[in-house]
């Protein structure tokens, strides 16, 4: 398996051990935990996490827990910043195919890196991004 990019919901479901996460997605996260691959977290996922906390849709301390996981440094989870190259990739993703801006940024990150996306968003293959789900 190659490295991958994660969508926000997949990351949340993995860290919460939520059964909504597919077996294939769970296996990729477990490979990351074993140090076999890297999973990139687009920084917009952090924005979505704060938003979901504010809406009380996830634990109010989820972002702090994620920060602790990332700070330890023994994980294959790596933040990937929103760069001008990601913005250029975003411009190539049709708004009609992926109308939600955070989803477009996540898709653009995967496209820029040339990696599959861990997501259940079935619109992504329409723009040429392979899914792991």
Residue ranges, per PLM feature:
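Short aromatic/basic micro-patch
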Residues: 5, 40-43, 81, 118
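Phosphate/NTP-binding elements of NTP-utilizing enzymes
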Residues: 49
């Amino acid at each position: 398996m190659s490295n991958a990019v994660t969508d926000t919901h997949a990351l949340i479901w993995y860290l919460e051990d939520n059964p909504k996460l597919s077996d294939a997605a769970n296996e990729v996260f477990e490979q990351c935990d074993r140090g076999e691959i890297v999973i990139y977290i687009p920084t917009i996922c952090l924005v979505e996490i704060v938003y979901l906390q504010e809406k009380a849709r996830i634990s109010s301390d989820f972002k702090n827990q994620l920060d602790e996981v990332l700070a330890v440094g023994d994980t294959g989870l790596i933040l990937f910043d929103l760069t001008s190259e990601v913005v250029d990739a975003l411009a190539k993703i049709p708004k009609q195919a992926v109308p939600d801006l955070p989803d477009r940024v996540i898709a653009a990150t995967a496209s820029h890196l040339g990696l599959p996306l861990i997501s259940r968003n079935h619109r992504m293959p329409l723009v040429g991004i392979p899914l792991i789900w």
